[in-house]
């Protein structure tokens, strides 16, 4: 099998999970409403079991099936967002896609009843209760666990670039936080988060997981919440670093970018040209810059040992993945990444709306509108 055939042999499939805010149409506050939303009212069958509660009752998560390419993924995302929007409107609610709500207080949100969430809250207390954040997770199918581990090691370098493109959480509890991705800093309070360290093999990773289970730290590897991980139950590498993207087109673009990066790294792996693996501490420096400044900052090019504007580095990244994007047929979706570089992210738009109106309600109204574009 050639390296290109390996990309197309039922691998590098896509699965996309989106976490949405449930917002009261009148108050624009988050509403603890997910149980009512999903209990089976008219139109519920459109979601076909692909939506579920999260820890807070004001959060609803949707997930595509296993998609063979980005076009199938887009079709499923349109259907899921559209169905969710329709259901929410019937109950006087609206759906918002963003990494944090601009002003709602976590202390006013109900926790979903369930053994898993009870255990998390019992263990983490207010760290868990305050974790009122919303993310985008992209799964890329990789059958061989050793290959998956190698790709998870190597893709870490590009995670700050991807985060910068996704930033959508500039507000927290009714204040500008000064960060483009407030969500990232809130989630840091959880254990077992952030950029993971390097693992020599999948066996090395599994021994780490086994030790945590044996010592009572976790009951299974799903409680390892790193920015990228080999999924414990699926044959995928899961990229978890993104803020929830507001526009559907941006979700599609970032999913295509994640797939293309994984594909390019696989091609290098098959050619014995593996990408250099950098230390966790170095990549965390770049992650902080993406959290703070988004696309307006500079990341460190560790090869050149100098700071480079994020927009320039993302442009280089798009050139780097051109080969795999052509194989996957995702060049059109990646053109949207260039538009994000030009137009800015959801965080930039939210800040502009607030600067113009001085109204968090206006920010939420704009988010509601932007979250339904393309449906």
UniProtKB/Swiss-Prot annotation:
Function as written in the Swiss-Prot or TrEMBL entry: ATP-dependent carboxylate-amine ligase which exhibits weak glutamate--cysteine ligase activity.
One BP term from GO: modified amino acid biosynthetic process
EC primary class: ligase
One Pfam family per UniProt: GCS2
HAMAP family cross-referenced by the UniProt entry: Glu_cys_ligase_2
Stored SUPFAM superfamilies: Glutamine synthetase/guanido kinase
EC number annotated for this UniProt entry: 6.3.2.2
Family: Belongs to the glutamate--cysteine ligase type 2 family. YbdK subfamily.
Catalytic activity: L-cysteine + L-glutamate + ATP = gamma-L-glutamyl-L-cysteine + ADP + phosphate + H(+)
PANTHER family on file: GLUTAMATE--CYSTEINE LIGASE 2-RELATED (PTHR36510:SF1)
Gene3D superfamilies (alphabetical): 3.30.590.20
Protein name: Putative glutamate--cysteine ligase 2
Molecular function in Gene Ontology: ATP binding; glutamate-cysteine ligase activity
Keywords: ATP-binding, Ligase, Nucleotide-binding
